[in-house]
Protein backbone atom coordinates (compact mmCIF):
# COMPACT_ATOMS: atom_id res chain seq x y z
CA UNK A 1 0.00 0.00 0.00
CA UNK A 2 1.21 3.46 -0.84
CA UNK A 3 -0.22 6.68 0.59
CA UNK A 4 -0.27 9.96 -1.31
CA UNK A 5 -1.54 13.43 -0.56
CA UNK A 6 -1.54 17.06 -1.54
CA UNK A 7 -0.86 20.16 0.48
CA UNK A 8 -4.06 22.13 1.02
CA UNK A 9 -3.32 24.63 -1.76
CA UNK A 10 -0.82 22.53 -3.67
CA UNK A 11 -0.90 20.67 -6.96
CA UNK A 12 2.15 18.47 -6.40
CA UNK A 13 1.41 14.87 -5.45
CA UNK A 14 3.42 13.85 -2.39
CA UNK A 15 4.16 10.29 -1.27
CA UNK A 16 3.51 10.09 2.46
CA UNK A 17 4.93 7.79 5.11
CA UNK A 18 1.76 8.07 7.17
CA UNK A 19 -1.47 10.04 7.19
CA UNK A 20 -3.85 11.17 9.92
CA UNK A 21 -7.59 11.48 9.52
CA UNK A 22 -9.06 13.57 12.33
CA UNK A 23 -12.78 12.90 12.85
CA UNK A 24 -14.97 15.23 14.89
CA UNK A 25 -17.15 12.53 16.34
CA UNK A 26 -18.18 8.98 15.65
CA UNK A 27 -20.60 10.02 12.90
CA UNK A 28 -17.69 11.06 10.69
CA UNK A 29 -15.87 7.82 11.46
CA UNK A 30 -19.02 5.84 10.61
CA UNK A 31 -19.27 7.73 7.31
CA UNK A 32 -15.71 6.73 6.38
CA UNK A 33 -16.38 3.10 7.35
CA UNK A 34 -19.57 3.02 5.25
CA UNK A 35 -17.68 4.56 2.32
CA UNK A 36 -14.93 1.93 2.58
CA UNK A 37 -17.47 -0.90 2.70
CA UNK A 38 -19.12 0.43 -0.48
CA UNK A 39 -15.73 0.92 -2.18
CA UNK A 40 -14.80 -2.68 -1.36
CA UNK A 41 -17.95 -3.91 -3.12
CA UNK A 42 -17.48 -1.67 -6.18
CA UNK A 43 -13.78 -2.45 -6.56
CA UNK A 44 -14.44 -6.20 -6.25
CA UNK A 45 -16.81 -5.91 -9.23
CA UNK A 46 -14.16 -4.04 -11.22
CA UNK A 47 -11.63 -6.76 -10.40
CA UNK A 48 -14.07 -9.40 -11.69
CA UNK A 49 -14.36 -7.40 -14.93
CA UNK A 50 -10.54 -7.54 -15.12
CA UNK A 51 -10.13 -3.77 -15.01
CA UNK A 52 -6.47 -2.84 -14.41
CA UNK A 53 -7.44 -0.30 -11.75
CA UNK A 54 -10.29 1.76 -10.37
CA UNK A 55 -10.71 4.64 -7.96
CA UNK A 56 -13.46 6.10 -5.80
CA UNK A 57 -13.82 9.56 -4.27
CA UNK A 58 -15.57 10.25 -0.98
CA UNK A 59 -16.87 13.49 -2.54
CA UNK A 60 -18.75 11.48 -5.21
CA UNK A 61 -20.24 9.11 -2.63
CA UNK A 62 -21.16 11.62 0.11
CA UNK A 63 -24.12 13.80 -0.89
CA UNK A 64 -23.32 16.22 1.97
CA UNK A 65 -19.77 16.90 0.68
CA UNK A 66 -19.11 20.59 -0.04
CA UNK A 67 -16.50 22.21 -2.29
CA UNK A 68 -13.41 23.04 -0.28
CA UNK A 69 -13.77 20.07 2.06
CA UNK A 70 -11.08 17.39 1.94
CA UNK A 71 -11.58 14.43 -0.37
CA UNK A 72 -10.62 10.84 0.39
CA UNK A 73 -9.65 8.75 -2.64
CA UNK A 74 -9.23 4.98 -2.72
CA UNK A 75 -7.33 3.49 -5.67
CA UNK A 76 -7.21 -0.25 -6.31
CA UNK A 77 -4.65 -1.55 -8.79
CA UNK A 78 -5.21 -5.13 -9.87
CA UNK A 79 -2.36 -7.35 -11.01
CA UNK A 80 -2.46 -8.33 -14.65
CA UNK A 81 -3.56 -11.86 -15.32
CA UNK A 82 -1.33 -13.98 -17.62
Protein language model annotation of sequence segments:
Residues 1-82:
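Positively charged, low-complexity terminal tracts
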Amino acid sequence: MRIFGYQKDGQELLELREATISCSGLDELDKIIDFLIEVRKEHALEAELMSPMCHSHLRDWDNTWKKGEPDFIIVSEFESLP
